[in-house]
């Protein structure tokens, strides 16, 4: 049995509302899906959160556009502080769909990478979970 130590953190589950709040606070997340031949794929992307869905700008020739449309995907957002040994992680699961339209309102994600991204990959989130760790001290 392991004893309590100040170097260990306390892990807490986040509520769905807390998960959505944290997800909307970061500019980059990780899109994950099962690619060809059952091989996992994970890429970092810029995104926005709008009305219970995740919006990602992508190019028609991108791996995500070719492999994610009408498919189950996962999306992960996190942040951490190594010095404080603290952070949080939010995981979303759902289905991705390609759209030509922009997200409603002024919610188009700012894309850091160059190139033309005329498509929107929209993830309809079916499940959202999260955890937060605080330093035990």
Located regions from the model:
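Extreme N-terminal tail/first-helix region
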Residues: 1-24
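A generic structural motif
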Residues: 49-51, 100, 129
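Short, structured beta-strand-loop surface elements
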Residues: 60-119, 125-127
């Amino acid at each position: 049995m392991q004893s309590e130590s100040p170097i260990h953190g306390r892990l807490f589950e986040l509520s769905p509302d807390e998960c959505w709040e944290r997800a909307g606070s970061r500019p980059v997340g990780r899109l994950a899906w099962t690619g060809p031949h059952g091989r996992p794929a994970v890429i970092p992307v810029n995104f926005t959160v709008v009305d219970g869905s995740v919006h990602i700008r992508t190019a028609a020739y991108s791996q995500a556009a070719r492999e994610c449309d009408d498919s189950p995907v996962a999306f992960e957002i996190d942040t951490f502080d190594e010095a404080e040994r603290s952070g949080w992680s939010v995981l979303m699961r759902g289905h991705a769909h390609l759209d030509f339209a922009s997200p409603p309102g002024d919610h188009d994600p700012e894309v850091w990478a160059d190139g033309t991204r005329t498509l929107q990959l929209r993830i309809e989130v079916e499940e959202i979970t999260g955890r937060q760790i605080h330093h035990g001290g």
